[in-house]
Design a protein with these regions (language model features):
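N-terminal assembly/interaction segments in proteins that build large macromolecular machines
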Residues: 1-168
Length: 168
């Protein structure tokens, strides 16, 4: 579990969804005391995180090994496509950069279309609120928890269980 504590101005938002089955903690940093507009934005973004399950806030946080694996998968898929059979690897890699960017946008919160207004991204929402509130606003970190996630489910085979009980 993670411990959240503000080191200055900002907002710590906690959002529980679906009767507490999904929980989100979000830390938002500001350079001035947070306004109601910033608190509302933090709440809305926490709801967005609960719904869309981003893995990271910013693209710079995505581990290099994830990007390398994703590139390898996309390259293998492209090579297996008969339409690309005669294309050299250099051309395929250029084609794949767009697909890779799309994949990264799906897992990075700041690049996702905002749940309450899909005409803007979460990043644009933060920039808009930052401008209208007259302060710097930055998403610092979040944790999304799902009840039961990470627990091993005991799977029993009914036939084996009956056989054990009957001594066979």
């Amino acid at each position: 579990f993670e411990k959240f504590s503000l080191s200055g101005n900002g907002v710590e938002e906690i959002y529980l969804h679906n009767g507490g089955k999904i929980g989100v903690m979000l830390e938002v940093e500001t350079d001035k005391p947070a306004t109601e507009e910033v608190r509302t934005m933090a709440h809305d973004i926490a709801m967005h995180i609960a719904a869309f399950s981003p893995s990271y806030i910013y693209e710079t946080e995505v581990p290099e090994d994830y990007v390398a694996k994703e590139k390898a998968i996309l390259l293998a898929q492209a090579k297996n496509d008969p339409k690309n059979a005669s294309k050299p690897d250099a051309i395929l890699e250029k084609m794949l950069s767009g697909r890779l960017q799309k994949s990264l946008k799906e897992i990075c919160l700041i690049e996702q279309p905002f749940a309450k207004d899909s005409s803007i991204t979460v990043g644009q929402l933060v920039a808009n609120v930052s401008k209208s509130a007259g302060m710097n606003v930055r998403l610092v970190r979040f944790v999304r928890l799902v009840m039961g996630e990470g627990l091993e489910k005991k799977s029993d085979n009914l036939a084996e269980e009956v056989a054990k009980m009957s001594g066979k």
